[in-house]
Amino acid sequence: MRRSTEFGVKTAGGSMTTIFERIIEGAVECDKVFEDENFIVIKDKFPQAPVHLLIIPKKHIEKLQDMQSDDFSLLSEAGKIIQLMARDFGIENGYRVVINNGLEGGQSVFHLHIHLLGGGLLGSIA
């Protein structure tokens, strides 16, 4: 038996499958703009800017704080994808890159992901 939550599905055993894992598996439709062996990039369903993409590693890592030493190369790969997406979406002149880490950091889906926002003048956050 599965019980749905806002951001994933809880199995009878209590383990959580996030919405991102279900997207990666192809079980949930999304607006995918890029995919390779390690990442999928989708348009955010609730955009906070004219361009709002989510760069999601296929490897399940709950949050940035949980990364192991062999995971850090994913951040370098993500940087290259961010540059590519910025070019492809015409936001090279300015964009914001955000990782929300943990509940207090505003993370709502507990599968590491990077927000890429742009396409207009973004308000200050600091």
Swiss-Prot record:
Residues 19-126 form the HIT domain. SUPFAM superfamilies: HIT-like. Signal peptide: none annotated. A motif (Histidine triad motif) lies at residues 111-115. One of its GO terms (molecular function) is catalytic activity. This is Uncharacterized HIT-like protein TC_0664.
